[in-house]
């Protein structure tokens, strides 16, 4: 999940991707993933975003089990991806770490870094088109204000859910 330290002062490279370890830019969080179940999941590859919180819903779906209790599960089942029925993820992936926030959708990523101790307030957000600019070099927020508005609402809902989970409320 990205090379350690500041660029130039520590070994490692994120290649063409922007960011390093502990960044919520692609160079800090984009990693390959592998799921294998011989005889059950056909070999293949995808560029669809996924996250470790997708594992539990996927495993439960694969073994036809239901989660216990009434707590909501983070993540989605990737089972439809394995059989070719999933063309888009549909549900965005939220991240918050070290005064950064990010929301990754099927095409766009909303990202921001808060200054000082403003971790509870949303920072100024940038929008990156991960399909056409996986290196996150160009902020396209001005060109897509409706996407910024929609993803900002999604990010706020996601953060509220995370805060409820942190308190043990769900």
Question: What do the PLM-derived regions correspond to, one by one?
Answer:
Residues 58, 136-139:
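A general alpha-helix detector
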Residues 143-157:
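A non-catalytic, amphipathic alpha-helix used as a structural packing/dimerization or gating element
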Residues 133:
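Intrinsically disordered, low-complexity polar regions and short flexible loop motifs
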Residues 3-26, 40-42, 48, 53-130, ...:
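C-terminal cap/loop subdomain of S1 sulfatases and analogous C-terminal strand-loop tails that border
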Residues 4, 138-146:
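Active-site-proximal N-terminal segment of extracellular/periplasmic enzymes that hydrolyze or transfer
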Residues 33-35:
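Short glycine- and hydrophobic/aromatic-rich loop-to-beta-strand nucleating segment
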């Amino acid at each position: 999940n990205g090379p350690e330290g500041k660029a130039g002062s520590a070994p490692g490279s994120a290649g063409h991707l922007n960011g390093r370890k502990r960044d919520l830019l692609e160079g800090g969080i984009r990693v390959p993933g592998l799921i294998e179940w011989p005889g059950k999941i056909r070999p293949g590859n995808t560029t669809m975003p996924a996250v470790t919180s997708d594992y539990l819903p996927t495993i439960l779906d694969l073994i036809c089990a239901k989660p216990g209790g009434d707590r909501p599960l983070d993540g989605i089942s990737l089972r439809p991806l394995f059989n070719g029925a999933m063309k888009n993820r549909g549900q965005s992936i939220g991240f918050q770490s070290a005064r950064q926030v990010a929301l990754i959708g099927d095409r766009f990523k909303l990202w921001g870094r808060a200054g000082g101790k403003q971790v509870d307030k949303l920072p100024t957000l940038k929008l990156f088109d991960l399909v056409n600019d996986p290196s996150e070099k160009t902020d396209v927020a001005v060109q897509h204000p409706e996407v910024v508005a929609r993803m900002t609402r999604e990010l706020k809902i996601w953060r509220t859910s995370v805060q409820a989970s942190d308190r043990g409320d769900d």
